[in-house]
Design a protein with these regions (language model features):
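Conserved H-loop
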Residues: 183-189
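Conserved ABC ATPase signature
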Residues: 130-134, 138-140
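ABC ATPase NBD coupling module
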Residues: 63-80, 104
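Conserved ABC ATPase "signature" region
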Residues: 61-66, 109-126, 177
Length: 228
């Protein structure tokens, strides 16, 4: 079980983010309105952008510390990231896309683990295809597989179902429930029913600040307030 602890500040134009929270494994939902700072936060955890000030720690590894001038490079953080649109390489086969993360992290090939993930996500029959020949749901499952084959300590999912229609979302949700037992996750979404099915804890963001943290009851209270 990976513990993530962060205390960060970041200004982007007129937007100022100041967030502090800890997670203790499971699936932590980042919930809030558009522009609340959810994607900015996961990009800082991944190392894609640096906080102006603060500290990010995963288990006993300090990933970022402005005071100590620590900023671990993206490829050394061992954090998987699945974006809204999957971001597969269109010129590579599914097999080559899956292998990309492992190679970038310098990991040895593990045939048994690869076979297990192919079975977990039901993508073994897609290996010879190019992303352009996949459905939206298949592309996202391949993106999940690529992230898992990095053997991540943490998986970041930024609106992974937002680009899918309702049938494809129903197709993917059972696979996400399986992933919940594979690796700790930070899951970004503004869709409460989706989070209620997957999340084990919630961080509510409002205009760049942490408004509340806790269990699913935080989500219930937030959605009730929005509807009220």
């Amino acid at each position: 079980m990976s513990m993530l602890a962060l205390d960060v500040e970041k200004r982007l134009g007129d937007f100022a983010l100041a967030a502090r929270f800890e997670t203790a494994g499971g699936v932590t939902a980042l919930f809030g309105a558009s522009g609340a700072g959810k994607t900015t936060l996961v990009n800082m955890i991944a190392g894609l952008i640096a906080p102006d000030r603060g500290r990010i720690r995963l288990d006993q590894t300090v990933l970022f510390d402005s005071a100590a001038r620590i900023d671990v490079p993206v490829h050394r953080r061992r954090i998987g990231y699945v974006f809204q649109e999957g971001r597969l390489f269109p010129h590579l086969s599914v097999a080559a896309n899956l292998d990309y993360g492992r190679r970038m992290c310098g990991l040895a090939r593990d045939g048994a683990e690869t076979a297990r993930i192919l079975d977990l996500l039901d993508i073994g029959h897609l290996l010879d295809r190019r992303p352009g020949k996949l459905s939206g749901g298949e592309r996202q499952r391949v993106a999940f597989g690529r992230a898992l084959l990095m053997r991540p300590r943490l998986l970041l999912l930024d609106e992974p179902l937002a680009s899918l229609d309702a049938p494809r979302k129903r197709e993917i949700l059972p696979y996400l429930e399986k992933l919940r037992d594979e690796v700790p996750m930070v899951y970004v979404s503004h869709h409460a029913p989706e989070l209620k099915r997957i999340a084990t804890s919630v961080v509510l963001l409002d205009a760049g600040r942490v408004a509340a943290t806790g269990g699913i009851e935080v989500l219930d209270a937030a959605t009730a307030e929005l509807m009220g």
